[in-house]
C-alpha cells in the first residue's frame, strides 16, 4: 500500500469495497448508489413493530413454537453483524460515517430471512471529530436504539440482550481491524473508548464492556466471555455458545424457568 495512505489527515483513495480484503475477504461489501435491489427491505419499516415482526417471520418459521426471545436475539445477531462490519471498516480505515440510519438503508435478506447485505445511498461523509458520541450517533441513535426498542417489544427479551449482541460484534471486529496496516489510530482509540465508557452522552452506556476476560481456576488460558447470554439455548436446536456466561449452568432448568 502507498505510504501516503497511512499519513494522518490524508484522504484515503479507497472505496469501501476496496477494504474488503484479508479477514474480510469473505464478507460482502454494501451496494452503494444506483437502483435498490429487488426484494431489499427498507429498514425504516422496522420502526413499526408489526412490520418488523412481518419481516422476521421467515426466520422465525425455522423454529416453530420456539421461544420468541431467542429467535429475535439470533435474528438480531445476523443483522448487527451485517451492519457492524461496514460501519467499522468505514470508521477505522476510511474515517467515514456511513449512512446506516434506519431511514437511509435497505437490508438484503437471504432465503432464511437473515440479513446478508446492505444497500446504502452513498459511502458517507468524512468525520471531523473523534468524539465517540458524535462518531457513533448515526449507528446508535438512528439505527440500533429504535430497532432494539422494537425487537424488545415484539419478543419480550430485555433490551440489554440486543445491546449485548451489538456490542459483542463491535468488540470482535474492532480487535480484528486493529491489526490492519491502514487503521486510523485515533479512530481506533475512539471506538475502544465506546466499549470502555460507563456513560455515553451523559447516560448509562448500553455497550459498556460487552465482552470480559477471566482466567478459569486451574487454567492458564485467558477466556473471553460475553457479559450477557444471547438466549440461544432457549431453542432446542442450540446449546450455549463458546463464550457464553452461562457455560456450566443447568440450562435445562433455565429453559423451564
Over which residues does each language-model region extend?
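N-terminal, charged low-complexity regulatory/assembly segments
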Residues: 1-92
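Compact nucleic-acid interaction/catalytic patches
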Residues: 252-257
Amino acid at each position: 500500500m502507498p505510504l501516503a495512505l497511512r499519513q494522518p489527515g490524508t484522504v484515503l483513495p479507497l472505496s469501501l469495497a476496496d477494504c474488503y480484503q484479508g479477514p474480510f475477504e469473505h464478507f460482502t461489501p454494501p451496494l452503494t448508489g444506483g437502483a435498490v435491489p429487488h426484494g431489499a427491505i427498507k429498514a425504516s419499516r422496522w420502526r413499526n413493530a408489526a412490520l418488523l415482526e412481518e419481516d422476521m417471520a421467515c426466520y422465525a418459521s425455522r423454529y416453530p413454537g420456539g421461544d420468541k426471545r431467542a429467535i429475535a436475539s439470533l435474528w438480531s445477531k445476523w443483522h448487527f453483524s451485517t451492519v457492524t462490519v461496514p460501519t467499522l471498516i468505514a470508521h477505522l480505515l476510511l474515517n467515514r460515517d456511513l449512512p446506516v440510519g434506519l431511514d437511509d438503508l435497505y437490508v438484503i435478506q437471504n432465503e432464511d430471512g437473515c440479513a446478508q447485505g446492505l444497500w446504502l445511498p452513498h459511502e458517507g461523509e468524512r468525520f471531523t471529530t473523534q468524539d465517540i458520541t458524535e462518531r457513533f450517533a448515526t449507528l446508535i441513535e438512528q439505527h440500533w436504539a429504535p430497532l432494539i426498542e422494537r425487537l424488545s417489544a415484539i419478543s419480550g427479551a430485555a433490551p440489554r440482550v440486543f445491546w449485548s449482541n451489538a456490542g459483542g460484534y463491535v468488540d470482535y471486529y474492532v480487535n480484528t481491524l486493529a491489526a490492519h496496516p491502514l487503521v486510523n489510530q485515533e479512530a481506533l482509540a475512539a471506538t475502544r473508548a465506546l466499549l470502555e465508557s460507563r456513560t455515553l452522552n451523559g447516560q448509562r452506556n448500553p455497550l459498556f464492556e460487552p465482552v470480559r476476560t477471566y482466567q478459569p481456576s486451574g487454567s492458564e488460558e485467558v477466556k473471553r466471555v460475553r457479559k450477557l447470554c444471547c438466549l440461544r439455548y432457549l431453542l432446542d436446536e442450540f446449546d450455549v455458545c463458546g463464550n457464553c456466561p452461562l457455560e456450566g449452568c443447568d440450562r435445562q432448568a433455565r429453559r423451564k424457568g
